[in-house]
Amino acid sequence: MISVTDIRRAFLDNECHTITKAFGYLHEDKAIALIKIGFHPTYIPKVLYNNVVEFVPEKLYLFKPRTVSPLDLISTITKLKNVDKFAAHINYHKNSILITGDKSLIVKCMPYMIISDDDIRFIREQFVGTNSIEYILSFINKESVYRMSYQFSENEIVTIINRDHFMYEPIYEHQVLDSDFLKTMLDRYGIVPINSGIIDDLCPEAIIEILMAVVRPRDAIRFLDIVNKNQLTENSVKNYIINDIRRGKIDYYIPYVEDFLEDRTEDLGIYANIFFEDAIDITKLDITKTELEHISKYMNYYTTYIDHIVNIILQNNYIDILASIIDYVQDVLTEELCIRIVCESTNPVPVTSLPIHSTLVMVMCIQMKYVDIVEFLDEIDIDTLIEKGADPITEYTFTTRWYNKHNDLITLYIKKYGFCPMMMKRLMFEYPLTKEASDHLLKTMDENRGAIMFFPRTIYTLPYLLCCNYKLIQKPIPFKEENRNIEYKKTNRVLCFDSLENAAFKSLIKIDSIPGLKTYNMKDITYEKSNDIICVRFIPQDSIHNEERRIKLQLFDIARLASYGLYYIPSRYLSLWTPVVNMIEGREYTNPQKIECLVILDLFSEEFIEYQNLGNAVSNKYELEYTISNYQAAINCLMSTLLIYLVLGSIRSISRTEDFVLSILNIFYKGLKINELLSEPVSGVCIELDKIKDRASSGDSSFIFLKKNELSKTLSLCEKVCVETILDNNQSFKSSK
């Protein structure tokens, strides 16, 4: 349990109405300790500024922009890849950032700064060369474009749009463009020419051709606004738009129809009532299912005919359509119809729209995985919800007032997330708790210290261990005396580094000292310094020609190196996947969407990061919003690596899949020096891996896309292995003390 004793004391002693207010009364040391683990209000008191600068500078965004000094800001954001949380601070200190003349820093900050014409002139003076200017300006934001008079060149526009497609909107509003350029952008990028530069080239045929390319209602409305009214009254244009409305593109033409099609209501048919009040008696029409689907969004225009529409829906068993208009048909909904809507409709309906909140309806909602089950609390007690297997604690619940209505719901939340700083921060500092609810929350947490509320299951889950453990113990790397009596041959290779402090060089030397590695591709390493360059000479290892054996031994090496505090980041295979971040934020995670490479490549020293630098390295590699701990980063590396070697290894394996999986697990444990044997069956994992193998072998792609939850069993296995790793590491450490 997160310790809230000091916060509770401050809350009671100072008669605070909010937990945020109580946080401001904490002693600086206590406050900084909580800030370090991500447990803090949206803003923190100025008195903490110096401590934050010293201990957690990446949290400077918690102060208002005027409080943060430009030097502290620049020093901090220079080291971070993701600076989204500093958006307001970056714009506030725009001039200080531009004056640095640091191109990479300016590029990083451009999306957040409101750039003026004077700023552009300054940038042009600082950076000579068209390519540099185009590159920097490509990161400009729409707010800047709306406020400046600077005219972008066509090349600059293309560069900007290549980076952010939707920047076409402010740019097209900003300046008149050549018609040929507009046509090219339409053909190449599908960008509607909403610019006065196209007006002279428009005719009815061109208007229709452009409308055929429109994919956003806003673009259609804005384009028709610039077209000459005489052309909009052409019959060919009218006929095309009427047919487009019949195809369901109603939002695209609402202003146009009201201005130009008042005399064509019969041609509009059932859709006429959306634009003109009760224009058509729809009881005289043969209404199709497609038409019902189209008008369901606009049912407020058909209230006169709601009984007629409901009769058609029920006669034809159109449950999906009934669900889409549920707020207009409350009087006809029985318990049976509510259950049918819940079970048969493609999209979930809001529980608040179901007029009957019976236990049976609730059970059906639970089975269909509804996220707003909490709304049944208006009729059903929380114990019944839990007994039936409901989880009322979801993202949706934050949008309601239920936490202030039910103390039992807060208690349930604490049982689920009381160990998780991120999730408790959301409820305590970001949700508008009443004073009474805040008091209950703090009392419950303070009176249930330790792990009392999380026994027996939660404490052995990976999310719990990620939040409650803070380190992995590393084995000391043995000293290896440098061998200077090596005879070099023509087959020797040389690597050069800029200093002895180079991270890749330090990793290389440490790797060379670790005994028992099987596949690391360098042996007989020696190095010397020459003209400020570090030259490393080595003999390449002999290749292992059996692919399956190479993969297994390589995983052994990765695990063995991890046991000595050198971790492999498999970003070449998984460029975006960080399951640990989801877990420490209390969110569900799924398998990666894509594996970038289907061949397991050789290992290189620069891919291994020392444990003490791992949090920063992983956070920057994946451009995370905040820096995760070294411990959390290590688990992310192990879980990602194991997943990759299971998936890609099984694709390359010629063994029976079950034998391969068990062998991989055994090797992984041996590499980490863990004396564990996983007792769980792996048949479900094998089924998933075989499907991936079949799909990969039937194509010739160098990568593979994965469907959501396609590897759920495999991920569960990887989680269990990580749990065993953490528990063994901590137990081994205790035993050795």
Swiss-Prot record:
Query: Record's InterPro entries?
Result: Poxvirus_E2 (IPR007585), Poxvirus_E2/O1 (IPR021155)
Q: Does the keyword Acetylation apply?
A: yes
| Alphabetical UniProt keywords | Acetylation, Disulfide bond, Early protein
Source organism of this protein record: Monkeypox virus
Establish whether keyword Disulfide bond is in the entry: yes
Cited function: Plays a role in intracellular enveloped virus (IEV) transport to the cell surface on microtubules. Together with protein OPG056, forms a complex that interacts with host KLC2 (kinesin light chain isoform 2) to engage the kinesin-1 complex and thereby promote IEV trafficking.
Return the similarity comment: Belongs to the orthopoxvirus OPG064 family.
Describe its partners and assembly state: Interacts with host KLC2; this interaction promotes IEV trafficking by engaging the host kinesin-1 complex. Interacts with protein OPG056.
User: What is the name of this protein?
Assistant: Protein OPG064
> What is the primary gene name for this protein?
OPG064
Q: Which Pfam families does the entry mention?
A: Pox_E2-like (PF04497)
PTM statement from Swiss-Prot or TrEMBL: N-acetylated on initiator methionine by host.
Kindly list the cysteine pairs connected by disulfide bridges: 496-535
- Residues annotated with N-acetylmethionine modification: 1
Induction comment: Expressed in the early phase of the viral replicative cycle.
